[in-house]
């Protein structure tokens, strides 16, 4: 497994075209994930992991319905991961983007990301016997009447 570790946002953006080029040549999938980064404190614990007693730190839909007098104004960095391959042949890298730099990063990321999707081929839809095309590409079964 090749792990380039946590790169700077600029270095990560320079790796994106390399990942897409390799994935296009090998005909494999590139996986991209993004999530809020919370550093775990094993001694004191984190309020973010205790949504029952501290619902203001929970970002789920249920927590947004609860009115809370004191809300968390803390800004969290965003962890972005990219990988392709599987098991021993997996190649991956990641970056951490601060909330204040997020808008600029997304603009650069989207332009680089779109450039890597040029080799996508639109799937051909299959026609069924009655001439209609299903959304899944499978034939529509028509029940015969006796």
From Swiss-Prot:
In its UniProt record, which GO terms are filed under biological process?
A: protein targeting to ER; SRP-dependent cotranslational protein targeting to membrane, signal sequence recognition; SRP-dependent cotranslational protein targeting to membrane, translocation
What does the record give as the function of this protein? Component of the signal recognition particle (SRP) complex, a ribonucleoprotein complex that mediates the cotranslational targeting of secretory and membrane proteins to the endoplasmic reticulum (ER). The SRP complex is required for the cotranslational protein translocation for ER import and preferentially recognizes strongly hydrophobic signal sequences. It is involved in targeting the nascent chain-ribosome (RNC) complex to the ER and is proposed to participate in the arrest of nascent chain elongation during membrane targeting.
Main localization category: cytoplasm
Family matches, as PANTHER family: SIGNAL RECOGNITION PARTICLE 14 KD PROTEIN
* Assembly and interaction partners: Component of a fungal signal recognition particle (SRP) complex that consists of a 7SL RNA molecule (scR1) and at least six protein subunits: SRP72, SRP68, SRP54, SEC65, SRP21 and SRP14. At least SRP14, SRP21, SRP68 and SRP72 are proposed to get assembled together with scR1 RNA as a pre-SRP complex in the nucleolus which is exported to the cytoplasm. SRP14 binds RNA as a homodimer.
What more the UniProt record tells us is: Present with 8000 molecules/cell in log phase SD medium.
Region entry Disordered: which residue ranges? 121-146
Phosphoserine modification, residue list = 8
Recorded source organism is Saccharomyces cerevisiae (strain ATCC 204508 / S288c) (Baker's yeast)
Which key words are in the record? Cytoplasm, Nucleus, Phosphoprotein, Ribonucleoprotein, RNA-binding, Signal recognition particle
Q: Name one GO molecular function term.
A: 7S RNA binding
Question: Is the Amino-acid biosynthesis keyword given for this protein?
Answer: no
Q: Which InterPro entries match?
A: Signal_recog_particle_SRP14, Signal_recog_particle_SRP9/14
A cellular-component GO term for this protein = nucleus
Q: Where does the protein end up?
A: Cytoplasm; Nucleus
Q: Could you tell me the superkingdom of the organism this chain comes from?
A: Eukaryota
One Pfam match: SRP14
> Would you tell me the protein name for this molecule?
Signal recognition particle subunit SRP14
Family classification: Belongs to the SRP14 family.
Please name the Gene3D superfamilies in this protein's record: Signal recognition particle alu RNA binding heterodimer, srp9/1 (3.30.720.10)
Where in the sequence does UniProt note compositional bias of the Basic residues kind?
A: 136-146
């Amino acid at each position: 497994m090749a792990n380039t570790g946590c790169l700077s946002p600029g270095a990560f953006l320079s790796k994106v075209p390399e990942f897409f080029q390799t994935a296009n040549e090998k005909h494999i999938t590139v996986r991209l994930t993004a999530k809020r980064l919370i550093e775990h404190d094993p001694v004191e614990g984190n309020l973010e992991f205790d949504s029952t007693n501290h619902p203001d730190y929970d970002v789920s839909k249920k927590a947004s319905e609860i009115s809370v007098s004191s809300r968390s104004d803390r800004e969290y960095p965003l962890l972005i991961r990219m990988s392709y391959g599987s098991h021993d042949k997996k190649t991956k890298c990641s970056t951490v983007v601060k909330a204040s730099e997020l808008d600029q990063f997304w603009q650069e990321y989207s332009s680089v990301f779109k450039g890597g999707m040029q080799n996508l081929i639109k799937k051909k839809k299959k026609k069924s016997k009655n001439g209609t095309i299903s959304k899944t590409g499978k034939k529509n079964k028509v029940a015969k009447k006796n």
